[in-house]
């Protein structure tokens, strides 16, 4: 039974919403003005949308992140979980940087996607020298490094034998036939003083040290809980190209062992590990992928080809359709928008990947797209193109959305319609109980995974679920989202959120009576 006071508050809030927010309110719909239940449904939808809006707006306002320039990397940095590199390779990292510019890095490799069964460890020693701020990747710092020594330790006899054979294929005779490698014994793969270099068999490179970024933030606005993150350069998605590739994006960040998220169990385990005691992470069951609800970026993301963006995905599992909002920026903290893309289409039912443990394969089709230039430079660029290559010729204006479906996409942005992509997803749950959604890493060469053989074997930065269910496609009103997620967002959103939240709390028991 609902409380009398709550009933009065409910109708008072409805009056405030209807009177104070005006026709621009997301709560007002033509079909919702005459029926209380329709109003409640609209209010609940606005509550969910404002949750996602609030999370993205937090990123677009800088997310209270401080970027250290030049970065101070001295200290001990560790992975926050089991990382997946293209191949796939399952790895955790533990890197120490010393005051004299030397470093010692552990790379622990595993036989599965939960990092519970270590197979071998690389111990890398060398020297690093920070250079200037990157001219290519804003917010990053370029660096040079020199290797002194690379050692390998196998954690089982079977792995030792396999690695011996692998190394001998690229370095014939490196491992004597009468003296194969043994378990838990350290062997040199690279030694500077005698010219020993047999790392090619493992497609090994430390070019990740050529691009560095350090971020600091206080979790939950608590000045006693500083978290420092070290972003190192990305690894080429084609393993054979790693030793020739200069990073143009970042890997998942390492956290400072001294200033890390206290909920990170993996951080503490990896911190205490070494080559003879590799980290064994707590086992977890793979979560079944359910593509439904709404998901948003957790940080300003960096892509190869110097792209900064945030993403908002909406999945309608009742009819296997999806919507994607891609907000592009000119800066590494996503404060200065350049253009937005709204895309929608269909996706297939998921199939467990036979190549990437823990992954689920999907096929996504894009058949509808809209573009909005958000600055003068982008609008001018789009207006340069002749004919019907990207919307109506010469018609682009800042902040005005245009449908490019009828021109089969937008040549200026490298997008052709219709378009098909072969995707891989995985789902995890963080320490706070939030669901995370990972989709496939984009190819380092800038191409698209438009064929099955180009399907990713590693993942992008995860999205976090902001709403467990999605509005019906006709209710999503993508045209209204451009302004809300840009730096030009209206100022009324917080009041809408609070009023809607109060309305939801006060109508909960009312709904139960009628259910």
Swiss-Prot record:
Cytoplasmic face residues: 514-515
GO molecular function: Wnt-protein binding
Keywords for the protein's UniProt record, in alphabetical order: Cell membrane, Glycoprotein, Membrane, Signal, Transmembrane, Wnt signaling pathway
TM regions (residue ranges): 496-513
Extracellular side: 27-495
Glycosylation sites: 100, 168, 319
Tissues and organs where the protein is expressed, per its UniProt entry: Expressed in both the mesenchyme and the ectoderm of the carapacial ridge.
Ranges in coiled-coil conformation: none
This protein's record includes keyword Acetylation: no
Biased composition annotated in UniProt, kind: Basic and acidic residues: 472-482
Signal peptide: 1-26
Pfam families reported in the protein's UniProt record: APCDDC
GO biological process: negative regulation of Wnt signaling pathway; Wnt signaling pathway
Location within or outside the cell: Cell membrane
Chain residue ranges for the region called Disordered: 437-486
Membrane topology per record: Single-pass type I membrane protein
Reported function: Negative regulator of the Wnt signaling pathway. Inhibits Wnt signaling in a cell-autonomous manner and functions upstream of beta-catenin.
Name the UniProt record assigns to this protein: Protein APCDD1
Species assigned in the record: Pelodiscus sinensis
The encoding gene: APCDD1
């Amino acid at each position: 039974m609902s409380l009398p006071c709550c009933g009065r508050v409910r109708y008072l809030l409805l009056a405030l919403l209807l009177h104070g927010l005006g026709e621009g309110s997301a709560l007002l719909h033509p079909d919702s003005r005459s029926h209380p239940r329709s109003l409640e449904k609209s209010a609940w939808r606005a509550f969910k949308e404002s949750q996602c809006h609030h999370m993205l707006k937090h990123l677009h306002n800088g997310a209270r992140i401080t970027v250290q320039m030049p970065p101070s990397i001295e200290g001990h940095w560790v992975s926050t979980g089991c990382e997946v590199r293209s191949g796939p390779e399952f790895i955790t990292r533990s890197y120490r940087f010393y005051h004299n510019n030397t470093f010692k890095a552990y790379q622990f490799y595993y036989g599965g996607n939960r990092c519970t069964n270590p197979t071998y460890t690389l111990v890398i020693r060398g020297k690093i020298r920070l250079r200037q701020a990157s001219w290519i990747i804003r917010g990053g710092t370029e660096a040079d490094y020199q290797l002194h020594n690379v050692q390998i330790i196998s954690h089982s006899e079977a792995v030792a034998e396999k690695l011996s054979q692998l190394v001998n294929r690229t370095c014939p005779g490196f491992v004597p036939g009468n003296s194969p490698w043994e378990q838990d014994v350290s062997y040199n793969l690279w030694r500077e003083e005698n010219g020993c270099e047999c790392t090619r068999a493992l497609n090994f490179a430390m070019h990740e040290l050529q691009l560095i970024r350090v971020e600091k933030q206080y979790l939950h606005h608590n000045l006693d809980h500083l978290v420092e993150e070290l972003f190192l350069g990305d690894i080429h998605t084609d393993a054979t190209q790693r030793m020739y590739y200069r990073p143009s994006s970042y890997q998942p960040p390492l956290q400072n062992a001294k200033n890390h998220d206290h909920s990170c169990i993996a951080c503490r385990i990896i911190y205490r590990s070494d080559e003879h005691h590799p980290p064994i992470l707590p086992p977890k069951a793979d979560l079944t992928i359910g593509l439904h609800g709404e998901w948003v970026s957790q940080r300003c993301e960096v892509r190869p080809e110097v792209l900064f963006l945030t993403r908002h995905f909406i999945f309608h599992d009742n009819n296997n359709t999806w919507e994607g909002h891609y907000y592009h920026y000119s800066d590494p903290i996503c404060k200065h928008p350049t253009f937005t893309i709204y895309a929608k289409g269909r996706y297939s039912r998921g199939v467990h990947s036979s190549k990437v443990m823990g992954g689920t394969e999907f096929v996504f089709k894009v058949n509808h797209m809209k573009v909005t230039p958000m600055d003068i430079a982008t609008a001018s660029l789009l207006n340069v193109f002749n004919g019907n290559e990207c919307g109506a010729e010469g018609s682009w204006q800042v902040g005005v959305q245009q449908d490019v479906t009828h021109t089969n996409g937008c040549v200026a942005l490298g997008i052709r319609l219709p378009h098909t992509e072969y995707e891989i997803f995985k789902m995890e749950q963080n320490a706070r109980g939030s669901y995370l959604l990972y989709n496939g890493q984009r190819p380092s060469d800038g191409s698209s995974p438009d064929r099955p053989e180009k399907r990713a074997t590693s993942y992008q930065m995860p999205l976090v679920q902001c709403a467990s269910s999605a509005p019906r496609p006709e209710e999503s009103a993508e045209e209204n989202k451009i302004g809300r997620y840009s730096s030009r967002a209206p100022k009324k959103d917080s009041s809408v959120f609070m009023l809607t939240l109060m309305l939801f709390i006060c109508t909960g028991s009312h709904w139960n009576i009628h259910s």
